[in-house]
């Protein structure tokens, strides 16, 4: 999963085997390789059910699940880094609880996702490219951190979490 986040967050300009395969098959490159830029996260979902409407719903659900997993992995990574950096046991407990609490806000974060593209393959499979702006999840995670029940010693930690979310998601491409 961590590799998937790295793949989503890293930009590359070399043609990949996925893009070569996509060109060969006559389908959009993003179906195989997703899309990458520094404004947000992208995820691809696929569905092939009895009709296009339910196939699209399935594809959107799969892509949103992938977005949720990417955000969760990123939040856990940021939080673990801060937990490792903090010395006080109380702050460590706060960060662990905040990380768990932030995972619960995934639905609010995903409400900011949008369909960026869709493709219907010759075999009837519907592919959907979903996009989640970084500003959406940084805002939601910061909101969650600021409303979290905290002690005075944890206020500093809360501030560091907000800074870490902003820094991580605005600098990783």
Regions found by a protein language model. Name each.
Residues 11-173:
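Domain-level marker for long, solvent-exposed, non-transmembrane regions
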């Amino acid at each position: 999963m961590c590799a998937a986040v790295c793949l989503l967050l890293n930009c590359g300009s070399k043609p990949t085997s996925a893009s070569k395969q996509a060109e060969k098959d006559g389908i959009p490159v993003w179906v195989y390789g997703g899309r990458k830029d520094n404004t947000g996260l992208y995820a691809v979902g696929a569905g092939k059910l009895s009709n296009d409407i339910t196939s699209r719903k399935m594809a959107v659900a799969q892509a949103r699940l992938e977005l949720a997993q990417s955000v969760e992995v990123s939040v856990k990574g940021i939080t673990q880094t801060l937990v490792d950096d903090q010395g006080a046991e109380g702050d460590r407990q706060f960060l662990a609880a905040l990380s768990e609490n932030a995972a619960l806000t995934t639905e609010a974060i995903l409400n900011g996702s949008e369909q960026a593209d869709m493709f219907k393959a010759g075999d009837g499979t519907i592919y959907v490219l979903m996009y989640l702006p970084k500003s959406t999840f940084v805002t939601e995670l910061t909101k969650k951190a600021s409303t979290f029940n905290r002690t005075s010693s944890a206020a500093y930690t809360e501030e560091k979490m907000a800074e870490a979310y902003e820094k991580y998601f605005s600098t990783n491409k």
